[in-house]
């Protein structure tokens, strides 16, 4: 409601939507660059809505990262016209780096988790969904022809890094940031094999899944895994619905989030088994910390309330990896 009541926020939101649509529908690099600059300037007031120091710091980090990406985008897109220059040979790679920086993809992901940890859940939702639409569309529709091998290697790195580092986090917003990095790996793999429509479909499913999750976490003021215990005080319907969203986000069959991953597996199975293996390994690690969040949200039964919690945690350290690894066996059998 605060966005509607404030004229500044209403203007920022409308400009944010229009600038993204302009960028997606653009047929000119300069027009695309201008639309993405307008998008950047529109999102910063939304990030700083509560005027606290943490959100201001996150907005500054976001501005610096996106400004660097915009500079690389402008330089590379204009230099590609100069076919006689030796520098123009490196411009497609520079353009790729600019888009990956704006997307928050490996190896240009340095700003993304820290910004996510500094802003509100509503801003996190916009940053993880709407703000990725324009760079992801460019990545899917314009760039894969000359960068297939590079994109596949970056997709594998996204999946691995998102899973490995995400397992060591306790802050929910940081976990969701590394989860997003892992999902970017799956989207990039679809873009690399010339399936842009499948890439966008995966992105739409991802946005549908994170929207109720982020909104609920923001409503309940949950910022750490220990705050997940608040869910047990609400109705069992809300609790179970959020747990199902988490499992779906992890790609567990037969939930909705498994469908785009199954589609990716079928597309990559014939000729890119190594990349597929790495993607599945990263997805299993993602599922590990989703299960960790789910267990944190479950209340202990009465007969276990007097049991030492360290004993339970030690046993879960063995149970969770075994359960998570067993869930990933079926794709390997298909290979």
UniProtKB/Swiss-Prot annotation:
The chain crosses the membrane at residues 7-27, 28-48, 58-78, 81-101, 110-130, 147-167, 174-194, 200-220, 240-260, 274-294, 315-335. The keyword Electron transport applies. It is found in: Mitochondrion inner membrane. The keyword Acetylation does not apply. Its EC number is 7.1.1.2. Disulfide bonds: none annotated. One of its GO terms (cellular component) is mitochondrial inner membrane. It is an enzyme of class 7 (translocase). GO terms for molecular function: NADH dehydrogenase (ubiquinone) activity. It holds the Pfam family Proton_antipo_M. GO terms for biological process: mitochondrial electron transport, NADH to ubiquinone. It catalyses: a ubiquinone + NADH + 5 H(+)(in) = a ubiquinol + NAD(+) + 4 H(+)(out). It is a multi-pass membrane protein. Keywords: Electron transport, Membrane, Mitochondrion, Mitochondrion inner membrane, NAD, Respiratory chain, Translocase, Transmembrane, Transmembrane helix, Transport, Ubiquinone. InterPro entries: Complex_I_Subunit_2, NADH_UbQ_OxRdtase_chain2, ND/Mrp_TM. Belongs to the complex I subunit 2 family. Core subunit of the mitochondrial membrane respiratory chain NADH dehydrogenase (Complex I) that is believed to belong to the minimal assembly required for catalysis. Complex I functions in the transfer of electrons from NADH to the respiratory chain. The immediate electron acceptor for the enzyme is believed to be ubiquinone. PANTHER family: NADH-UBIQUINONE OXIDOREDUCTASE CHAIN 2. This is NADH-ubiquinone oxidoreductase chain 2. It comes from Lumbricus terrestris. The gene is ND2.
